Amino acid sequence: MLKLFSAFRKDKIWDFDGGIHPPEMKTQSNGTPLRQVPLAPRFVIPLKQHIGAEGELCVSVGDRVLRGQALTRGRGRMLPVHAPTSGTVIAIAPHSTAHPSALAELSVIIDADGEDRWIEREGWSDYRAHSREALIERIHQYGVAGLGGAGFPTGVKLQGGGDKITTLIINAAECEPYITADDRLMQDCAAQIVEGIRILAHILQPREVLIGIEDNKPQAISMLRAVLADAHDISLRVIPTKYPSGGAKQLTRILTGKQVPHGGRSSDIGVLMQNVGTAYAVKRAVIDGEPITERVVTLTGEAVSRPGNVWARLGTPVRHLLNDAGFCPSADQMVIMGGPLMGFTLPWLDVPVVKITNCLLAPSVTEMGAPQEEKSCIRCSACADACPADLLPQQLYWFSKGQQHDKATAHHIADCIECGACAWVCPSNIPLVQYFRQEKAEINAIRLEEKRAAEAKARFEARQARLEREKAARLARHKSAAVQPAAKDQDAIAAALARVKEKQAQATQPVVIQAGSQPDNSAVIAAREARKAQARAKQAAHPMADSAIPGDDPSKAAVEAAIARAKARKQEQQAGSEPAEPVDPRKAAVEAAIARAKARKQEQQAGSEPVEAVDPRKAAVEAAIARAKARKQEQQTGSEPAEAVDPRKAAVEAAIARAKARKQEQQTGSEPAEPIDPRKAAVEAAIARAKARKQEQQAGSEPAEPADPRKAAVAAAIARVQAKKAAQQQVVNED
């Protein structure tokens, strides 16, 4: 009795909520053995036939390839694809693939040569001699992916399982109507499938291995039982026929009673699941050394005359397979890739067969029925009762239609397995699965964009951190590379700084002056006397050199005299703006007479002595001083009324003065005179005038009268005569 209860517990199965029982329609194709299809003349191999990124190309246009030769390199989740036959690569270009929207993907197009030659194959018959990692790498490089419909890379799935897998489940349920590919494969290749299961068990080392198969496959069940008759490491579980019992979460629930959490995976509860077709592909990759180049495809539907299951090479056009099955299309004929519930209609028949293609359904018009019009949801909740994932399809429908992505995510739309049970039972004929697929695609696109933004932000922050680190390192290098002065240099610098500080301290000390004391200037006085003595000695040593220096150019002297006259004229104009008082001619005549008397007396006194040359500079200075004194006297006497000026007398006196000056020049012209520098004379005259002007400004506090123009004219005439005399003397000396 105890053994009976143990056996009962061992073979116990559970049930899942929801599910439907549609017509199976499997007998059309599962009654005939697997057969080979003639090679197509051209193959189109998409680079991406799995979940993940496409691999890196390793062939070029014009290359000749063999069957099983890798067309791409697989790294990470990039699964390689292989040539399905021998031939020549004629193009590498985008081509429409097996997708509901017939998207174009990069593909390698090969023209078959008809020889179908293999690459050199190396099998591992004793696979237990190889490590777990080597087996996983071989499975990955030979292009094995999930053949049940998901297309997830098998090597990546095995690597992710690690040591936490306790139960390995082989999915042989094949619950969708019309599809019999796994059923026929188990009938014809049961031993190879079991061998592949043992390879997977060797890699994962689980505690138990379970095969789940529906009870509507009696021939396959009998074949597996025959192979497993003496095996105790693998258990075969027959489950009731119910759609979708072949789903990963649903089959896990049926065989183990465990529930996969929302948003989780079966590996989270220690379960890993593989398809029977995948197990067969693993056996061929490891033991036979053959990459996956073909798979079993069901050709069924009332539009084909020879339904059945065939070995279809990957990349074979759908049209070629249907024509081999006797395809008789009708008007508005549809062809579905996959089953009637989870498949999609092909837009045209030139798309190729890929790794996830398990069925090509060509129904007649009466078989599928006419398409019905979509109506409004009546909130009947039939979809919720049929959902095997315990979701609320009617709510997800409204969220998807209203673009409410957050609410759809909160209601676990990601857990939808797109089985189509909700759409099957919907009385309003609403294509719920299409809405859910579109909503999930939009959510994935939003998440991908957010991920890219986060990665860009992380790259920016990493770059900023790197720049900061480089800046800090650069500053540290600069500081460490700075030249440090040696000890000797430091001593010299310290001594120099001490001297500077001492001088600064001395400069800042206050000077103390004692009353009654005199400064000691003896050194300065001695230096001045020495310079004077040196100058006198130098002058005595060269007495003749100085006298022999000829005068400057008379033309320059004339120019400078003209400049002096212009300045005097400008000064007269500036002074002419103020009204001038009348000049007293009597005073002017008296002063002119006094000047003549003084000059005559000086000539008489100097008559006995040789006449020296007249120094025009002294004369100009004396004339300026005389004019200043006269001006001052006029200002002092300006309060008295002046008599009327007789212009005739003034003119006579000026003429007499000019005649006397000319006579004096003639008397002194016979003796040689020292050369006179007219420029110096003009400069000294200008200095004298400036001094006189300054004296006038200082005396400007009292009201001043305008200067006597006659005196100025007389002085200017005398200056001109003296300049002319100097020029004549210069000419005589040159001769």
UniProtKB/Swiss-Prot annotation:
It is a peripheral membrane protein. InterPro entries: 4Fe4S_Fe-S-bd, 4Fe4S_Fe_S_CS, Ion_transpt_RnfC/RsxC, Nuo51_FMN-bd, Nuo51_FMN-bd_sf, RnfC_N, Soluble_ligand-bd. The keyword Coiled coil does not apply. Residues 368-397, 407-436 form the 4Fe-4S ferredoxin-type domain. It holds the Pfam family Complex1_51K. GO terms for molecular function: 4 iron, 4 sulfur cluster binding; electron transfer activity; metal ion binding. Keywords: 4Fe-4S, Cell inner membrane, Cell membrane, Electron transport, Iron, Iron-sulfur, Membrane, Metal-binding, Repeat, Translocase, Transport. Residues 556-565 have a biased composition (Low complexity). [4Fe-4S] cluster 2 binds at C387, C416, C419, C422. Its cofactor is [4Fe-4S] cluster. Binds 2 [4Fe-4S] clusters per subunit. GO terms for cellular component: plasma membrane. SUPFAM superfamilies: alpha-helical ferredoxin (SSF46548), Nqo1 FMN-binding domain-like (SSF142019). Residues 538-715 are annotated as: Disordered. Part of a membrane-bound complex that couples electron transfer with translocation of ions across the membrane. Required to maintain the reduced state of SoxR. Belongs to the 4Fe4S bacterial-type ferredoxin family. RnfC subfamily. The complex is composed of six subunits: RsxA, RsxB, RsxC, RsxD, RsxE and RsxG. This is Ion-translocating oxidoreductase complex subunit C. It comes from Salmonella typhimurium (strain LT2 / SGSC1412 / ATCC 700720). The gene is rsxC.
